[in-house]
Amino acid sequence: MGRGFWKIPVCLGLVLCSLAEAQKIKVIVDQDARGPGTSDQQAVLVFLNSEKFDVLGITTVSGDQWVKEETQHTLRMLELDGRTDVPVYQGAEFPLINSKEESERWEAMYGKFEYKGAWTDKFKANRSIIYEMPYHDPDVVPPMPEGEPKIKAHSGTASEFIIEMVHKYPGEVVLWAGGPLTNYALALKLDPEVATLAKEFVLMGSGLYANKGAIDKGAIDARREFNWWFDPEAARIVLRAPWKKMTITPIDISVKTRYTTGMKAQIAKAGTPIAQYLDKYSLPGYMWDEIAGIALIDPSIITGQKKLYMDIDIDHGASYGKTLFWDASATVPPYERLADVQFDIDVEKFNRIFVDLMTRPAGKR
């Protein structure tokens, strides 16, 4: 009998490992992952570097850059982080209806947009863009300063992958969005059950009360935020879907955060490949997307939120792409859905968690 005792701790260890895996949050990370080293990519790293997440896959969507370019930057970052186990699925190249030409017609009538993502005529090197780049067509992938990836995206579309995962793990998958909502809108149109099968929908987007003077890129005005403006029709489809729970990180809370030179220096001291990557390519600025990930790790960082009915204006006039919202007690049209909208944050705690995640060693958690 004594010879069998060694099996007990081994079996117990296996059971505990299995329980830990089962308790992880299954998540699909959908992102307009401009790279290298932006808030977009830093938000993806939040999920990759936390032991609380089982990242089923990363899906890319045009927004801050064209999707082919974003996909390549994401694949390269996975290599640097030792997370080539995570599949990447390339998603929508264009919004459902909106287009570069449509936005230019709007500008001719109503005024200029400061920031247009992939449609921007020229990215100028400044405090939020690390290298200058002129506009290019969606099929062009410019030379990558961080190096070309050796791994490739998986076959199949982002929307197909989303549908497959919520059916495989009904009631377990958190769907997360850090960019325009095109991939999720397409998934919902292909299979309306996506909303009821998902555990929760979490997104960064919308603008409600933010002071325009405090916003340098995320909004054209206080209620027209980039992610929703880039594909308003997709946002309408997603916002009206019957999610069990929907949580929204608007720019109102994002502009209360700053990625500082001090945080960057702390991260650089770790000396890991990702720390070196961020030291070389990240720049100080608002942390647009990271809040929506870290709040899933530690909800206590959110110190204030409201229940609001959320929608978007898709009338092709002066208000196209603007956030619409009503208080939970209001009488609203029958299609609007309630969401938990974040407004206040414990910045110190948020910063500590972020720096910790960015300094962890490479490899699967």
Would you name each region that the model predicts?
Residues 1-10:
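Bacterial N-terminal signal peptides that target proteins for export
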Residues 9-17:
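Bacterial N-terminal signal peptides
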Residues 18-22:
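Sec/Tat signal peptide C-region and signal peptidase I cleavage site
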Residues 23-25, 42-50, 54-55, 226-365:
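Conformational coupling and interaction surfaces
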Residues 23-84, 101, 121, 125-247, ...:
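Active-site histidine-anchored catalytic micro-motif
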Residues 87-95:
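A short, structured active-site edge motif that brings together acidic residues
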Residues 94-98, 254-256:
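A short acidic, often aromatic-flanked loop/helix-cap motif at beta-alpha or helix-coil junctions
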Residues 105-123:
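A charged helix-plus-loop insertion that forms the helical arch/lid used to bind
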